[in-house]
Amino acid sequence: MSQPESTSQDQLPTWVESSLFKGMLRGIERETLRMQSNGFLSQGSHPKALGSALTHPHITTDYSEALMEFITPPKASIQETLDYLKDIHAVAHKHLENGEKLWPLSMPCMLDDSDESIRLAQYGTSNIGLFKTLYRRGLGVRYGRRMQTISGVHYNLSFPDQLFEALQHNEKDEALKALSAQDYRSHRYLGLIRNFIRLTPLVMFLVGASPSVCKCFMTGREHQLLPLLKGTLYLPFATALRMGRFGYQNSAQKELGIHYNNLPDYLNGLQKAVKTSYKSFSRLGLNDADGEPLQINDHVLQIENEYYSLVRPKQVPQEGETPSGALANRGIGYVELRAVDVNPYSPIGIDENTAGFLEVLALYCLFTESPELLEKEQDVIDKNQTEVVNRGRAPNATIVENGKSYFIEDWSRTYLDKMQAFAELLDHSYETQIYSKALQIMQARINEVDETLSAKMIEDTVEYGGTWSFGSYLAQKHAEAYEQHQLSKKASAYFKEVAQASLDKQEQLEQDTTQSFEEYLSQFR
């Protein structure tokens, strides 16, 4: 990536001032499995005291009934967001049943040999509830249920209107100056997304935290992983196996050619995918032997959400809008950064160092020139990601960029140096040192790879005697942190009220019987 003409290598444009960043918003989504006291995946239902997983705004489920998802609202600072996430964890932990705990690793706790023991998330008997469960059943028959037990952290980030206005005002390209505010904002967010994809190996190297897996996760799969200890497989220099071929992937999607070079093409690609049949999925059948639906349809994507990517353009949908409909109508409103492993050492799965680093990186990606991302370059990026996932901490691990090969430490250091000015700018905007401190922590990980999360995890997994023992130790430690967390009376009352309101909302949805589920489903087939 080259720098914009208006900046020197390590310098921001002269017109940039800290007030432009007032109004940035961020939100976090954190996934975590409920684990039984024996270390196996929970077979219990989502605790009713936490409300309805269908309609609760902050505590829901992802693929499995046991895979919880905690969602903060957009907040004005990193600290406020992390504090809110702590509240959610404390509430969820309080209502876990039968001695269950929250599993602290991205890669799952113990699974038995049967996929059927990975229960699909249940959302009640309304059409939308049944539809959500069927979507998950379809994912299971397409890709297997094991893959869907992996947890991650999604970091949502938006920049304020005045920043885009200033960027557009200072554009040299008259065509870009002439765009509507909405179209220009989408144009800049897409530039951010392309650059973030280019720099994803940096995220995997510095905050990757899935270098090993429980042996049970690989049941029935071919692999080249090595035994670390009894019951644990790993690669010696791996950083983020979750992001590699053992993690979530969809080979059918690779054929789509969906890209982030402009919004209309991205949306057209998505629309085509949700309407085009795919032979492998057609062969699975739409219904099982008993006539029960197996998948929503046989299309490349059952619904838009099935499209998996490391970063997503997002817009808050209004009632009745699809994600792509919201983007088409109002442009990109924020980005969702999805290449982030759960930090097992944090009770809430992420700390302020990772949050600060991601925000500086995103701002750097927004300001830096971002040419179109074409297939040839994407192939190189894919190879870079594979290198970092499998052997990012190896002494001779390399990154290829613009036809040249670099040692990963040198490559990473170059980009962190370029980001320094952006960290200082954000520190000034927020009257904090969070951002500069985050870069210092990441710099220390580059200088000494044994300081990376993935290296520490290997060391601790050996010390505690395996994935399960290490994860169980952390789960207990984090449970104590949740119990010690002081929830304010206001927050306590709010979560109680929201839980009940979500149950009432689900019941209301279930009373609407004007359309059978078969009729509802036919719209998508």
Predicted regions and their residues:
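Terminal catalytic/cofactor-binding subdomain
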Residues: 2-140, 147-153, 184-194, 198-201
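Loop-rich catalytic cores of soluble enzymes, especially ATP-dependent carboxylate-amine ligases
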Residues: 13-14, 129-142, 149, 158-327, ...
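Secondary-structure capping and boundary motifs in well-ordered enzyme cores
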Residues: 24, 131, 147-151, 188, ...
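Histidine-centered divalent-metal-coordination microenvironment in nucleic-acid enzymes
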Residues: 31, 147-160, 334-341
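Short conserved micro-motifs at the rims of enzyme active sites and ligand-binding pockets
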Residues: 43-45, 82, 115-116, 167-168, ...
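A glycine-rich phosphate-binding loop feature that marks nucleotide/adenosyl-phosphate handling sites
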Residues: 108-109, 214-217, 378-388, 435-444
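Substrate-recognition/cap regions that form aromatic- and gly/pro-loop-enriched pockets
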Residues: 328-329, 335-427
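Extended, compositionally biased alpha-helical segments that mediate assembly or anchoring
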Residues: 428-525
